[in-house]
Amino acid sequence: MAGPPASLSARDVGSFAYLSVKDRSPQILTKAIDTLHRHKSEFFEKHGEKGLEAEKKAISLLSKLRNELQTDKPIVPLVEKFVDTDIWNQYLEYQQSLLNESDGKPRWFLSPWLFVECYMYRRIHEAIIQSPPIDDFDIFKEFKDQNFFESQESIIALCTHLQELRKTIEDLDENQLKNEFFKVLQISLWGNKCDLSLSGGEHISQKTNIMNSLEDLKPFILVNDMDRLWSLLSNCKKTREKESVTRVDIVLDNSGFELITDLVLADFLLSSKLATKIHFYGKTIPWFVSDTTLHDFNWIIKQLKHSNNKWVSQCGVDWEDHVKTGRWVYLDHIFWTLPHEFSAMSQVAPDLHAALQKAHLIFFKGDLNYRKLTGDRRWEFTVPFHEALSGFHPAPLCSIRTLKAEVQVGLQPGQGEQLTASEPNWLTAGKYGVFQFDGPL
């Protein structure tokens, strides 16, 4: 039996992976360096001369990293001892064992794109932790915060809709509840457009009311398994014993506006009784510019709570209460910031895999999670999603993703080719989305 197809890689000149490594990654490193420059006086105020020395050191390390990338130098092992350093360096050795290049060393433009892109963000983190006393500085925080502040109009509309819905949710019949469920799912999907790593850190925010666009956006959903999600969760609700739990896990993607759309979905799941407990999974370190960390999660809820809009503030109060009472649980794990595809989870992070197996449903948000679900490979468009998961089935799962990388499976025959003919960049523009489910039929 043939093995899985080759990984996406920058060795394919002109591909999205190639353009990302050639242009977007150096641009992100430049923005990271600029951010450190801009915070120079803050570092001095907090730490004196040591803060300035640390800023210079971090900039020097990031400049070196940018040079290594742009000149296609060999990928080097991590040096700073951190909880995941050994796993990273073992993975680098594994990548080296796959190569038969002249010097047998993984390089930026030759190795799998998923690996080198994750490695870049891990090296950015290494540059910061090697530079105390600024070693707890989140180099991407201001980009995430700006996305939140620029999306206020949409946030107000969303929170208002949610609070109005909660007043009447007990009175909705099954069909009405299903329609509202589909709405919050679509809000969470299109919230995924706000990805700062795709824009090279340029500002992306949701300035218009997404609620008004849902009907217009429906034709851009290429795979729509929302009915299967409804069947699964409504069945859980109907068969649930009085004291038993229905747990939905959400593997988060971006902070800012997208995180709020995910929290709206999570709130709806509780208030509709489709779920009784939500586990959120975020990143342990700043990642892919806009990914959610524990600090981001808590910061967003606090910002909402202190809003001068009563509905937004009410959401903040309610969500803080969900966290305090344990209905919402935020968790992180180093596996989410490793370069491994998810099919390796049971070997690399058996504790995380075992935790996910206890969920009734897992939502995987966003593009990076989709790439890791499918191994970021050159799959044919019609390959079933179940097959592309390569044995990763901890529980029923669903990818909620707008397309921003050249990997997509589970399409109808001819669907991908038709899109390629009419819109050459359909895979990477963030215009199309999927709800792709894998679980019992």
Curated annotation (Swiss-Prot):
UniProt cross-references to SUPFAM superfamilies, sorted A to Z: AF1104-like
Residues binding S-adenosyl-L-methionine, per UniProt: E258, D291
Pfam annotation, one family: ARMT1-like_dom
Sites of N6-acetyllysine modification: K40
Residue numbers of N-acetylalanine PTMs: A2
EC number: 3.1.3.-, 2.1.1.-
This protein's UniProt keywords: Acetylation, DNA damage, Hydrolase, Manganese, Metal-binding, Methyltransferase, Nickel, Phosphoprotein, S-adenosyl-L-methionine, Transferase
Cofactor(s) needed: Mn(2+); Ni(2+)
Modification Phosphoserine occurs at: S102
Catalysed reaction equations from the record: beta-D-fructose 1-phosphate + H2O = D-fructose + phosphate; beta-D-fructose 6-phosphate = dihydroxyacetone + D-glyceraldehyde 3-phosphate; L-glutamyl-[protein] + S-adenosyl-L-methionine = [protein]-L-glutamate 5-O-methyl ester + S-adenosyl-L-homocysteine
PTM comment text: Automethylated.
Residue positions binding substrate: D253, N254, D367, L368, N369, Y370, R371, K404
InterPro entries tied to this protein: ARMT-1-like_metal-bd_sf (IPR036075), ARMT1 (IPR039763), ARMT1-like_metal-bd (IPR002791)
MF terms in GO: fructose 6-phosphate aldolase activity; fructose-1-phosphatase activity; metal ion binding; phosphatase activity; protein carboxyl O-methyltransferase activity; protein-glutamate O-methyltransferase activity; S-adenosylmethionine-dependent methyltransferase activity
GO BP annotations listed: DNA damage response; methylation
Its biological purpose: Metal-dependent phosphatase that shows phosphatase activity against several substrates, including fructose-1-phosphate and fructose-6-phosphate. Its preference for fructose-1-phosphate, a strong glycating agent that causes DNA damage rather than a canonical yeast metabolite, suggests a damage-control function in hexose phosphate metabolism. Has also been shown to have O-methyltransferase activity that methylates glutamate residues of target proteins to form gamma-glutamyl methyl ester residues. Possibly methylates PCNA, suggesting it is involved in the DNA damage response.
Similarity comment: family membership: Belongs to the damage-control phosphatase family. Sugar phosphate phosphatase III subfamily.
Protein name per the record: Damage-control phosphatase ARMT1
Protein's organism: Bos taurus
Gene (name only): ARMT1
